[in-house]
Amino acid sequence: MRLPVCLILLGPLIAQGTEEDCPHKKAVTLLPSFTMTPTATESTASPTTSHRPTTTSHGNVTVHTSSGPTTVTHNPATTTSHGNATISHATVSPTTNGTATSPRSSTVGPHPGPPPPSPSPRSKGALGNYTWANGSQPCVQLQAQIQIRILYPIQGGRKAWGISVLNPNKTKVQGGCDGTHPHLSLSFPYGQLTFGFKQDLHQSPSTVYLDYMAVEYNVSFPQAAQWTFMAQNSSLRELQAPLGQSFCCGNASIVLSPAVHLDLLSLRLQAAQLPDKGHFGPCFSCNRDQSLLLPLIIGLVLLGLLTLVLIAFCITRRRQSTYQPL
């Protein structure tokens, strides 16, 4: 025990003497050795998903998907808006390059409805009597066989005339007794006719005439390129008659346009001052009837004069034959 203690006590003295013997040597401090092992730090970036709002469109819908190391973008194939909503559904097919495209959308127009019926054939029993009254007092009365003539286009760029006759049993009457402007409307399957009349109180005698007419008709003529026909004319002065009289004509034709004509057969019309109980006033013949009557009267007069001349000539010859020469 004493020996180790002595060694411990003598240690510093020996070290001090050594320092004095070697003044040029530096002291070295020994540190315990250890090993540093670098630790790899793994950083994992969590993928971030962003959703971009899409807007509903009526055209093609294209969905783009882009994939990267940190960001993934998804465009939903179906988008529904909560306003005036239109829902577009896209069918996406898988691809390998990260882009999916829906097929092109096609817009199909509405299928045309069934064609309107063919024009009605002519019939002798198609004479209709159409009356509109203000209470118990009639103001417009029309009696006629009504037929519509239409010049319609056909295949090949040509045109043809089509004729359709109104059926009185399938025609509804409406109208108005508006002072000096009465009117009459005839509604029938797939069409309508409107007659507008005007009184001329400044003329002597006062008259009433047709000043406006419109027609709208849906009809399927043979090989026709269209079905709907419309025309109107607001500058007419037709079917004119004195107030209190009815306009009478065997065949009155009204031209609404170069392609739409209206024929009124066996016509009798009165649009003002009708007698009670739906009767017509005295008949006023149309110009066509008057133009035929005047040549007939002139012809009969000439024939009568010629007959008188022949009779006078025969009498003169007979008197001359009774005298005998001396």
Curated annotation (Swiss-Prot):
Cytoplasmic side: 317-326
Family that this chain belongs to: Belongs to the LAMP family.
Sequence repeats: 44-49, 50-64, 65-72, 73-88
Top-level division of the source organism's lineage: Eukaryota
Keyword rRNA processing attached: no
Residue stretches spanning the membrane: 292-316
Tissue localization of expression: Expressed in tissue macrophages and to a lesser extent in dendritic cells.
Keyword Nucleotide-binding annotated: no
Gene name for this UniProt entry: Cd68
Signal peptide: 1-20
Glycosylation: residue positions: 60, 84, 97, 129, 134, 169, 218, 233, 251
Chain segments carrying region Mucin-like: 21-109
InterPro entries according to UniProt: Lamp2-like_luminal, LAMP_CS, Lysosome-assoc_membr_glycop
PTM (free text): N- and O-glycosylated.
Protein name: Macrosialin
A Pfam family matched in the record: Lamp2-like_luminal
GO BP: cellular response to lipopolysaccharide; cellular response to nutrient levels; cellular response to oxidised low-density lipoprotein particle stimulus; inflammatory response to antigenic stimulus; negative regulation of dendritic cell antigen processing and presentation
Feature: compositional bias, Low complexity: 38-58, 70-80
Comp. bias intervals (Pro residues): 111-120
Bias-annotated ranges (Polar residues): 59-69, 81-108
Task of the protein: Could play a role in phagocytic activities of tissue macrophages, both in intracellular lysosomal metabolism and extracellular cell-cell and cell-pathogen interactions. Binds to tissue- and organ-specific lectins or selectins, allowing homing of macrophage subsets to particular sites. Rapid recirculation of CD68 from endosomes and lysosomes to the plasma membrane may allow macrophages to crawl over selectin-bearing substrates or other cells.
